[in-house]
């Protein structure tokens, strides 16, 4: 019995994880945002930063793929969640209607 309690005391408690700020850094310096043609610099991915989010949305309103944006898998997941959160908040439209198309 005494041996079990000694083992429990030596086990470290779980540390709370700090929330990491997602940063958009081009992988290997080759990421190019397809809409602008400019290399992507260092940005903090946030749903309130609509100027950045719009660059990763197609003219039809779809989220661009990793191949088109050059993001890593982790950055793409964070970007998709930020775009979805901005859509629900009304900051970014769900669908972009082009001038010649009908509803």
From Swiss-Prot:
Predominant location category: plastid
Designated name of the protein: Small ribosomal subunit protein bS18c
Signal peptide start and end residues: none
Species this chain originates from: Chlorella vulgaris
Origin: domain of life: Eukaryota
InterPro entries linked: Ribosomal_bS18 (IPR001648), Ribosomal_bS18_CS (IPR018275), Ribosomal_bS18_sf (IPR036870)
Gene from which the chain derives: rps18
A molecular-function term among this protein's GO annotations: structural constituent of ribosome
Keyword terms, alphabetized: Chloroplast, Plastid, Ribonucleoprotein, Ribosomal protein, RNA-binding, rRNA-binding
GO cellular component: chloroplast; mitochondrial small ribosomal subunit
One Pfam family hit: Ribosomal_S18
UniProt keyword annotation of Transferase present: no
UniProt entry tagged with the keyword RNA-binding: yes
Location in or out of the cell: Plastid, Chloroplast
One GO BP annotation of this record: translation
Family: Belongs to the bacterial ribosomal protein bS18 family.
Subunit relationships: Part of the 30S ribosomal subunit.
